């Protein structure tokens, strides 16, 4: 998948953030590391719970507070905690209420406490986080340092899902629910295809997949508000190359349908936050859910890369 948001970012008069001379904000040298630390810092700064603070770094909290001061009332950074809150709100709708044994899998969890919360809320379920070995090691270290009790039904699997099929990482087991938060921004078209094939193969019949998605048509709305425009653009500049922004919602739906998934539903994070009585973030993100049918239908033709995509090696 190429980077459809590039023309937007090019026209925004972005603040200069030169990373060539090193990690100037101590968030990490790679886009995924910077993103994980910034998101963890935003959750800690804006939610300020024992778990979010424990899972964040000092530099992540400092940068998040700095951006929060710039952000003011635009609520750009609030969409980081909001997407987690909406996914937690939707989870009960996606798992069988009467099943005694459940397998809930979160992939590329980063420093999110969401799987920890799932393990606490669903003690009859086995909750598995799948992530890179260094991320798992650092997360365990932070939880221990923060004296966060780890439920007995939560465990970690160390795997690079770019090399290891998800089902192999789970020793052939299939899940009732697979979730992904914070990964989609970094996926190319081929990586999206691989992810959805992996998820379909690893879900039990009747199981659900939940993932957050970003859309070019929503980002274009930022240009109408200079304040939101500037803050959001700075955030995206910090996290680096983000090829996974899709042109629109129909582009996202094709990834589900190509693997035969049904009941595809979009939940606009800002709208759901309003419905549950929480502060609404700026409308940048949606949560998409879908179901693996009980019987497999004929597979549709493979999804094609979006027609208006920019070159895959482009940078924001």
Language-model features, listed with the residues they occupy:
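Rossmann-like AdoMet
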Residues: 2-105, 109-157, 173
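Short amphipathic alpha-helix with an adjacent loop that forms part of the alpha/beta core around
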Residues: 164-173
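A short SAM/SAH-binding and catalytic strip from SAM-dependent methyltransferases
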Residues: 175-191
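A short glycine-rich, Lys/Arg-flanked "PGG" loop and its adjoining helix->strand segment in the class I
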Residues: 193-205
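Conserved beta-strand signature within the Rossmann-like core of class I S-adenosyl-L-methionine
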Residues: 203-217
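Conserved Class I S-adenosyl-L-methionine
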Residues: 223-246
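Short alpha-helix
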Residues: 243-266
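Core SAM-dependent methyltransferase catalytic element
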Residues: 275-306, 316
């Amino acid at each position: 998948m190429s980077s459809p948001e590039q023309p937007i970012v090019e026209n925004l008069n972005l603040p200069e953030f030169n990373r060539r001379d090193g990690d100037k904000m101590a968030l990490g040298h790679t886009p995924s590391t910077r993103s994980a630390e910034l998101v963890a810092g935003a959750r800690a700064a804006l939610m300020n719970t024992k778990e979010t603070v424990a899972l964040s770094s000092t530099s992540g909290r400092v940068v998040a507070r700095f951006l929060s001061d710039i952000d003011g009332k635009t609520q750009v950074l609030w969409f980081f905690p909001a997407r987690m809150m909406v996914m937690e709100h939707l989870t009960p709708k996606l798992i069988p209420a009467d099943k005694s044994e459940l397998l809930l899998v979160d992939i590329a969890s980063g420093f999110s406490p969401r799987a920890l919360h799932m393990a606490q809320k669903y003690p009859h379920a086995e909750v598995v986080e799948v992530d890179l070995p260094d991320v798992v090691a650092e997360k365990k270290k932070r939880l221990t340092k923060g004296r966060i009790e780890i439920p007995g039904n939560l465990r970690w699997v160390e795997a690079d899902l770019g090399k290891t099929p998800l089902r192999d990482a789970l020793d052939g087991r299939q899940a009732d629910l697979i979730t992904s938060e914070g990964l989609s921004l970094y996926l190319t078209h081929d990586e999206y295809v691989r992810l959805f094939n992996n998820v379909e193969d690893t879900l039990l019949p009747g199981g659900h997949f939940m993932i957050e998605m970003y859309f070019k048509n929503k980002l274009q709305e930022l240009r109408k508000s200079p304040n939101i425009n500037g803050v959001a653009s700075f955030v995206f500049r910090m996290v680096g190359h983000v090829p996974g922004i899709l042109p629109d919602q129909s582009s996202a739906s094709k990834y589900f349908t190509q693997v035969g998934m049904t009941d595809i539903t979009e939940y606009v994070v800002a709208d759901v936050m309003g419905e549950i009585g929480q502060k609404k973030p700026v409308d940048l993100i949606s949560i998409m859910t879908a179901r693996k049918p009980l019987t497999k239908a004929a597979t549709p033709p493979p999804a094609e890369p979006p027609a208006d995509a920019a070159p895959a090696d482009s940078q924001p």
